[in-house]
Amino acid sequence: MQTLYLDAFSGISGDMFLGALLDLGLDFEQLKTELAKLHVHGYELTQQREAQSSIYGTSFDVQVAGGKDHGFVEHHHHQHEAGHHHDHEARHLADIEALIDGSDLSDTVKHHAKAIFMEIAQAEAAVHHMPLAEVHFHEVGALDSIVDIVGCCIGLELMQIDTIMASPLSDGSGFINVAHGQMPVPVPAVMQMRVGSAIPIQQRLDVHTELITPTGMGLVKTLVREFGPLPENAVPTRVGYGFGKRDTGGFNALRAVLFEKKKLSQQIVNRTADAVLMIEANLDDQTGEGLGYVMNQLLTAGAYDVFFTPIQMKKDRPATKLTVLGNVNDKDLLTKLILQETTTIGVRYQTWQRTIMQRHFLTVATPYGDVQVKVATYQDIEKKMPEYADCAQLAQQFHIPFRTVYQAALVAVDQLDEEA
């Protein structure tokens, strides 16, 4: 069995996922043979090896006979798949589950495909405030999207991939145009699927369109159980790129990496040291509300940390020292924010070297629900810390002490270690 890492620096969609698997070596003819077990007809699959920004990858597409370009429609499930064609047939969740159950696909593929559709259906039901049974899959229920989702599950089985990890996902910002007006990014179904999941998502303010489709988010939420950078003990064996079809103004691809893990003692551990920028300013006439606002603005802009220290200035004035830690490349951005949002007329800079533990996330199942756990490593040192937000949410939901959920998460992590 193999481990797959998804580097979603430009988001994720169904066709990008399949394109990446094909670029990694998934047999196209085998994929078509397995998809025929759905017992549906009237579609054609295409793959094309091409280059974006001089980097070669694979584009995957589904075309439905007699269909037309759907462009941007109500639920907007396929921003990345803007070239797909279908007949706009609407299906309910029960119709899709019956189609999958009636196929000759393996039980594993059926289970995963139905779970993905369930995630999307639950999100749509919440967004549109309707019973789950009444949700219409105006797009994901269409044939091309069924092929996307089932095809991804088939591809993972054919390639014997049993473990999937992912980077933090990237999404765009602003608004997109749909049949009934404008929709914010992340789109509502994607945002709804984030509820209770702790899937890390960063918004790119330089991209004014959708990067994560509900199909892509459904795939990630159902199949990915660990988030973070590529493990430091990973030895990549193959890299593939699946291209999206949206013009994002940049390199629009999902990078997929097949890798093997080696023991940390077998390799030199790198990337434990880097430089961090520290910016300081003394403020003796800034309101408390203003301080809170600038902290939020700086953190939103990418600062690593922001904190305040009470100080005594000349003429015995009580004041506040603002300290901002951030990336050295963000010096101008953070400086402009400080000068714009505070009363200071100058700032101080220092660059510090630091040693950091490598971090990644995994999800563990507790009796109360899933909890994200941060795993930090440095040489032979390892620390595991359940995420506060997950534990707090479950403690409130079940009216139990926070510590009870926290300890349950630690027990679940220990069980994973024993199984490994």
Curated annotation (Swiss-Prot):
Top EC category: lyase
Q: Which NCBIfam families match?
A: nickel pincer cofactor biosynthesis protein LarC (TIGR00299)
Detail the disulphide connectivity of this chain as listed in its UniProt entry: none
This entry's comment on induction and repression of expression is: Induced by L-lactate and repressed by D-lactate. Is thus regulated by the L-lactate/D-lactate ratio. Makes part of the lar operon (larABCDE).
Organism field: Lactiplantibacillus plantarum (strain ATCC BAA-793 / NCIMB 8826 / WCFS1)
Could you say what a knockout of this gene produces? Deletion of this gene leads to a loss of lactate racemase activity.
Database matches in Pfam families: Ni_insertion
Q: Which UniProt keywords apply?
A: Lyase, Nickel
Provide the protein name: Pyridinium-3,5-bisthiocarboxylic acid mononucleotide nickel insertion protein
Taxon lineage: Bacteria, Bacillati, Bacillota, Bacilli, Lactobacillales
Q: What role does it play?
A: Involved in the biosynthesis of a nickel-pincer cofactor ((SCS)Ni(II) pincer complex). Binds Ni(2+), and functions in nickel delivery to pyridinium-3,5-bisthiocarboxylic acid mononucleotide (P2TMN), to form the mature cofactor. Is required for the activation of the lactate racemase LarA. May also be involved in the activation of other nickel-pincer cofactor-dependent enzymes.
GO biological process terms held by the UniProt record: protein maturation; viral translational frameshifting
Q: Which family does it belong to?
A: Belongs to the LarC family.
This enzyme catalyses: Ni(II)-pyridinium-3,5-bisthiocarboxylate mononucleotide = pyridinium-3,5-bisthiocarboxylate mononucleotide + Ni(2+)
Which molecular function term from Gene Ontology is one that the record holds? lyase activity
Q: Which gene encodes it?
A: larC
HAMAP family listed in its UniProt record:
LarC
Record EC number: 4.99.1.12
